[in-house]
Amino acid sequence: ADKQTFGLRTDSLKKEVRQRLGIDAMLAQCVKSEAILSKTRKFDGYTVQNFALETLPGLYVCGSIYTPQSKGKHALIICPNGHFGGGRYREDQQQRMGTLARMGAICVDYDLFGWGESILQVGSAAHRSSAAHTIQAMNGLLILDYMLASRKDIDTGRIGANGGSGGGTHTVLLSVLDDRFTASAPVVSLASHFDGGCPCESGMPIQLSAGGTCNAELAATFAPLPQLIVSDGGDWTASVPTLEFPYLQRIYGFYHAKDKVTNVHLPNEKHDFGPNKRNAVYDFFADVFHLDKKKLDESKVTIEPEAAMYSFGEKGELLPEGAIRSFDKVAAYFDKKVFARLNSDTSLEKKAMDWVASLNLNDERKA
């Protein structure tokens, strides 16, 4: 292979991934509306504001926007979430978001479909459906659209994606779907032999694109832009230093950009988003987005209670009147024949549960 050959394959992959994900049919049905915003909470060097963005009619994605208190144009990092217990509300997630914001990047995280406040609308079982794969990708793209349309303090030359585990899978997917991303950092997710154990990562047949692909090749389509792969010895990313990373270096080499892809491998660590993994992310974005590394101090981040990060109240009492309140209502937006294949079934549920059990997260808040 060479640069020209891989460039043609990249074009084919990007086109077919969109088709197999069904993303354009969903985006065509989305509404343009003002986000529901909470009051802004001020902390040491950054602020936090909750948002609820209507996507499909009556369907909302909820999250939080972490903004630096420094003036001027900022980098933007979209942060899809993984399956670690506590979701986007957990302590290490808030630490990462707040720290990157203090360093100078606007960071946005958001609930998985069927997690967090999304449960109010579709229930938790909806997450274990293939529909989650498409909707979560759609949410990431629409949040990027919203942020760029509503803010004047974003440097469009510095747009990143970063997530761990399933959030890492979606980080790669976002970079395939949208050319506006300029840096990518999937954490404890990338493997050539594993496409993500949850239907929200692998429910739609995107791995069959262009005659068959894998997440390592999808990540390679980001070349020659900066990309960090964080891996460890305790999960399916154990092979990254000997298999996936050399492959990525080869592809980046076609563009004379071998130095633009990096791997931080932690052989004695397990599947989590622990301090060493977060530090790798901070170093990467400080380098590629010129953030202020002197502001790297997680102890300055305030860990908020989960309820403070809700858009719809502690019991969902603020959910808008026209909001969808069942997973079946979401089905109306999918082609009926397609949706028959998407709906949560026992095999997908078993796959999801077996996968969670296999992780051995040793986390009191299991996925």
Predicted segments with their positions:
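Flexible loop/turn segments at secondary-structure boundaries
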Residues: 59, 84-87, 115-119, 168-171, ...
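Primarily recognizes the serine-hydrolase "nucleophile elbow" in alpha/beta-hydrolase
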Residues: 145-211
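Alpha-helical segments flanking ligand/cofactor-binding loops in enzyme cores
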Residues: 98, 172-173, 220
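Hydrophobic alpha-helical scaffolding
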Residues: 130-133, 137, 164, 171-175, ...
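Loop/turn elements at helix/coil->beta-strand transitions in domains of secreted/extracellular proteins
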Residues: 73-76, 103-106, 155-158, 179-183, ...
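Cap/lid segment of the alpha/beta-hydrolase catalytic domain
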Residues: 69-156, 189-200
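The feature captures the conserved acid-bearing segment of alpha/beta-hydrolase catalytic domains
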Residues: 183, 195-253
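Alpha/beta-hydrolase-fold serine-hydrolase catalytic core, especially in secreted/extracellular enzymes
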Residues: 1-61, 89, 230-367
